[in-house]
Curated annotation (Swiss-Prot):
<dbReference type="GO" id="GO:0010764">
    <property type="term" value="P:negative regulation of fibroblast migration"/>
</dbReference>
<keyword id="KW-0969">Cilium</keyword>
<dbReference type="GO" id="GO:1900016">
    <property type="term" value="P:negative regulation of cytokine production involved in inflammatory response"/>
</dbReference>
<feature type="compositionally biased region" description="Polar residues">
    <location>
        <begin position="8"/>
        <end position="25"/>
    </location>
</feature>
<feature type="region of interest" description="Disordered">
    <location>
        <begin position="1"/>
        <end position="40"/>
    </location>
</feature>
<dbReference type="GO" id="GO:0050728">
    <property type="term" value="P:negative regulation of inflammatory response"/>
</dbReference>
<dbReference type="GO" id="GO:0060271">
    <property type="term" value="P:cilium assembly"/>
</dbReference>
<comment type="subunit">
    <text>Interacts with unc119 family proteins; interaction preferentially takes place when unc119 proteins are unliganded with myristoylated proteins.</text>
</comment>
<keyword id="KW-0395">Inflammatory response</keyword>
<dbReference type="GO" id="GO:0005737">
    <property type="term" value="C:cytoplasm"/>
</dbReference>
<dbReference type="GO" id="GO:0035869">
    <property type="term" value="C:ciliary transition zone"/>
</dbReference>
<dbReference type="GO" id="GO:0006954">
    <property type="term" value="P:inflammatory response"/>
</dbReference>
<keyword id="KW-0963">Cytoplasm</keyword>
<dbReference type="GO" id="GO:0015031">
    <property type="term" value="P:protein transport"/>
</dbReference>
<keyword id="KW-0653">Protein transport</keyword>
<protein>
    <recommendedName>
        <fullName>Macrophage immunometabolism regulator</fullName>
    </recommendedName>
</protein>
<keyword id="KW-0813">Transport</keyword>
Amino acid sequence: MEVDINGVNRTNNSVPSTAEGSSPSKPDPEKPRCSSTPCSPIRRTVSGYQILHMDANFLVGFTTGGELLKLAQKCATTEETPGESLPAFRSKQLESGLSRSSRIYKARGRQFQPYDIPAVNGRRRRRMPSSGDKCNKAVPYEPYKAAHGPLPLCLLKGKRAHSKSLDYLNLDKMNIKESADTEVLQYQLQHLTLRGDRVFARNNT
């Protein structure tokens, strides 16, 4: 006698088990496997609704009851006649869709273009103003600001060109006698590099 894992006799239950195993394998003719999908090739019904025709994988229309026969006859007659009106209608739909999409694309490009440019080119346009920008904004007409970085404030003010803040340039060793010398020095510092050696070479010669 064969005993199952659960302790039940296998000989007694062998025949019903085969019957139970064979019953679900038989397909039910009333309920096909893919009847839930609208595109079922077996039956084109969705819970009592019959689909008239499908277009581009979208459900176009469906009806029930007595209207189905009339619409089926109409569809049969339209299928027999050469379908010239349908392609024309579809081409019109495609053209209108293309023009609409191009219009939307143009509008999007117009709307988002100023915001997309900084992300592509870099962060220069969205850069926060620094202290050097403030210094340049004080004298925007000066042409030297494109040559090098911002100059210290003591150089921008002509009266204080000989102040102690220029010690890092070693300019305190120079003997400035006249105001014309200060103007020349300021001009040289603005239009040349901020190296004291070149200033000394210019003044010594």
